[in-house]
Amino acid sequence: HSGIFDGAAIDATHVKAHRSAAGAKGAFAQAIGRSRGGRTTKVHGLVDDHGRPRVLLLSAGNINDISIAAALIQAAGPFRKLLADKGYDADHLRRLLAERGAEAVIPSTTSRRAPIPYDTLAYKDRNRVERMWCRLKDFRRVATRYDKLARNYLSSVLLAATCAYWLK
């Protein structure tokens, strides 16, 4: 194995924060933000071509997905294709992927004047990341955030990912 995985998929999910999760000092320590669903944390993830999580990061629930995308991509290591939804359609992200030698399989937003073509057959595999979120949210500790500190909640998510995907 060369260490380069073929495809990677990226996405984020909202997790509702229980009322007991509030109270840690500082917004960064909490990673809890107000969104339409109330107080939430957002878990950002990048999965490999087998649907196994490679990188998981937290942010406040009101942060948009693309603001964490560069950090996920940098932490992931080399890959050939990145599959993402329309929320990740930005020129700066496409440039970052081109610099890394990766193909962007991202549909264009409707506001883009000249839509950029993408591999629609490869895009069908993007559901790997959605299936990963469903599997991780089977763990009660991941589905609802009860921890005050972001680092404690992230540890719970990483432990659930390890149990679900890496221990066999």
Which residues are covered by each model-predicted region?
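Short alpha-helical elements
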Residues: 1-168
